[in-house]
Each structure stands twice: as C-alpha cells, then as structure tokens.
C-alpha cells in the first residue's frame, strides 16, 4: 500500500454486547475485526471488580454479576489513525438471572398452593422449559419425574401465602421472579409487599443443589418479607442474605424448625429493626456455630429467641453492643444446652433485655465450664437464676463463671 498524505480512520468492529456467565471467560479477540491487523490492539475494562480483561489478549473473566464497558483500542501508523470501539460486557450470575426453579430429586408430586394475596395476580410456571401455564386452583399439583424442573413467575409484589410442598427437590434461581411487577427479576433488589415470601418453602423437603444457588438478592426489605420462609423444612444450608438494612420482623422464624440446617448465612446488617432476627434459627438442632452479629445499635426484641432450642450450638457470636434495647437478647440462647461461652460487652441495660437469655444454656453433661465474658467497665453482673418480667437485671445463671471476676466490695 502506498504512503498517504494523511492516515485514514481505522476500521475496528466488535459486537455491541456479549454475555459471559459468572466465573467463565470469553475471548474478545476472536470477534474483533480490523483491516490493519498488524497493529497492536489493547483492551480495558471499566470496572475490573465485575469483569477483568487481559490488556493484550482480550480475554474477559466474569467475576460478579453486573455490566462493564470494555474499550478496545488499536494503534495508529502512517496509514491509519488510532481507533477505538466499545463492547458492553454482561457478567451474568446464572442463578440470579434464572427464575425460581424447583428440580425434582425423585419421582413424586409437587404442590403449588395459593391463598389470599397470592390469588390476586396469577402465578405462572413452566415445566422443563415448556409452555407457560397458570395456576388456576387454590391448590395445584404437578406429577414430576426425577430431574424435572419447574420454573415459577409472578408479577404480584404482595404475593404472600404462596407455598410449595411435596416431592423432595432442589431449589435454585432467583426468588424475585415471584414478586417483580415488570418481570425484570434479575435486576430487582427491593421487596415491597408485606410478608411477600412468607411460608414459601415451609414444610418442604428442600435441599441445596450441588452446583446451583438459591438467590435471595433483595437489599431493600419489607416487614415480615421472609418470615417462616423455610419453616420446618429439610434445608441443610441457608442461602446468602445480602441486606444491610433490615425491616421489622423481616427474618422472623425464617429457618425455625430446620433440624437439618448445619450452616447459617452471614448476617452483615448494621441497621436493625424490631424483632428482625426473632426466632430466626429456633429449633435448628444441627446448627453448631452462630453467624457473627456486627451491629452495635440494637432494636426492640431484635434477637429474641434467635437461637432458642439450638441444642448443638457451641459457639455464640460476640455481642458487641454497649447499650441494650428493650428485650433485645430476651431468650436469645434459651435451651442451647451445649453452649459454654458468651461474650457480652454491654454496659447499659434495658427492660427485659436479658430476660431468660441463657435459660437452660450449657446444661448438657458434655459441658464442663461455662463462661460469660463481660466488659471490664460493667461490674453489675451477678449469678442468679431468677427472672422477673419488666426488669433490667444483669443476671447470668448459677454455674457460669463471670470473666473478669466481679471485684469484691
């Protein structure tokens, strides 16, 4: 090619958009077209936290759900000017984009039950990605073979009282597919309806899939939104709960009675609400370790009976709050018979905050020592098995050692 007085514009072409499943890679260099192929091409991601791209090879690695722009640049020379184009790359979390899915673990019947608000806007479903169908009765039963998949959809933000029961199954996909009015569940992070997903999996023989995840992605919660969600189910591992600002009663009894639950989710919320965690893990008799509770400002009855009856629990979370609120730790570890240590750094009490909080804790024959670790500034603790309603006593049961020891008067 002969030299030109002025270089001409580069020809650089690439798809407007590519989708890369989270955790996988995609080679952009294979879809980039240019005339001046000998000139160096470079790649740059607008947000490497979502998706990285190798600067020279163009290999994209999807890290977390989201969207980035990858800028593709080509060097100029005496014949061609520098050129640029942009590709929109979706790093897609497959489970976040897939609607709530129940996969039968064995042959049997799956029941879909609609009561009250769940009847005001239809719940729809597909079996094995077939035709969309609509639940027309209060109780609707599907005959499934092992491996059959049922996907569920609804635009009812106030769903409430929709319950799944029957055959043993794996649950994965995004629960927001049931309560997204615009059908855009993969981007919906807000629950707007009272008790929207209450009792959803209650009493169900439900298990965690070996490679898929059940997604509860909401960061904006509504009162009672997840209450009793897995009540008395066979769930063995809880899904992630990303919300950092809670609503009243939002997790009430969410996993209560899940006797197979061995692993609790991380609870990173800093802003609590009345009874937000009340009864959350009550009766989870296989749970041995409690999740950390980082919040330092408490709310009325926020942790009431949270771990009540967790007879296998040996590790309690550190209770960092200095100021207690009405009923905040009431019955929190009641019946945790294998618990042997609690760290409570509170210095200011509140009515009923410690009522019954360690009743029956550490009473198993395997427990040889029981220790309450206190804040050094708080010397009001005393061993006492009594509890009177409406008091603000610093009581820890007899048989528990207070550490550091309370100085003699």
Regions found by a protein language model. Give the residues of each.
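Solvent-exposed loop and capping/linker segments of extracellular ligand-binding repeat ectodomains
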Residues: 1-4, 90-409
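Extracytoplasmic soluble-region selector
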Residues: 2-93
């Amino acid at each position: 090619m002969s030299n030109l007085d002025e270089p001409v514009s580069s020809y650089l072409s690439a798809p407007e958009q590519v989708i890369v499943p989270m955790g996988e890679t995609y080679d952009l260099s294979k879809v980039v077209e240019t005339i001046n192929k000998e000139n160096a091409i470079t790649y740059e991601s607008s947000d490497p936290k979502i998706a990285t791209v190798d600067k020279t090879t163009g290999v994209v690695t999807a890290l977390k759900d989201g969207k980035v722009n990858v800028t593709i640049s080509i060097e100029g020379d005496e014949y061609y000017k520098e050129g640029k184009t942009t590709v929109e790359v979706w790093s897609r979390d497959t489970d976040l984009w897939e609607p709530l899915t129940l996969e039968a673990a064995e042959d049997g019947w799956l029941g879909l039950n609609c009561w009250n608000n769940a009847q005001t806007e239809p719940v729809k479903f597909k079996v094995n990605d077939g035709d969309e169908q609509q639940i027309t009765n209060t109780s609707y039963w599907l005959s499934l073979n092992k491996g059959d998949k049922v996907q569920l959809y609804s635009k009812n933000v106030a769903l409430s009282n929709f319950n799944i029961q029957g055959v043993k199954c794996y649950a994965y996909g995004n629960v927001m597919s049931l309560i997204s009015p615009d059908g855009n569940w993969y981007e919906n992070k807000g629950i707007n309806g009272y008790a929207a997903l209450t009792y959803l999996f209650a009493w169900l023989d439900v298990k965690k899939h070996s490679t898929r995840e059940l997604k509860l992605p909401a960061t904006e919660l509504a009162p009672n939104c997840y209450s009793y969600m897995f009540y008395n189910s066979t769930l063995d591992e809880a899904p992630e709960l990303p919300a950092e600002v809670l609503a009243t009663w939002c997790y009430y009894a969410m996993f209560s009675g899940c006797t197979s639950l061995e692993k609790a989710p991380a609870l990173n919320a800093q802003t609590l609400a009345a009874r937000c965690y009340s009864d959350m893990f009550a009766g989870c008799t296989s749970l041995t370790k409690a999740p950390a509770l980082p919040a330092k400002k408490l709310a009325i009855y926020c942790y009431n009976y949270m771990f009540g009856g967790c007879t296998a629990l040996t590790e309690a979370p550190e209770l960092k709050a200095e100021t207690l609120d009405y009923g905040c730790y009431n019955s929190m570890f009641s019946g945790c018979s294998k618990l042997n240590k609690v760290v409570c750094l509170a210095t200011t009490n509140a009515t009923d905050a410690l009522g019954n909080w360690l009743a029956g804790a550490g009473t198993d024959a395997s427990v040889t020592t029981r220790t309450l670790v206190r804040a050094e500034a708080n010397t009001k603790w005393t061993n006492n098995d009594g509890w009177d309603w409406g008091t603000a006593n610093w009581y820890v049961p007899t048989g528990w050692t207070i550490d550091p020891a309370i100085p003699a008067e």
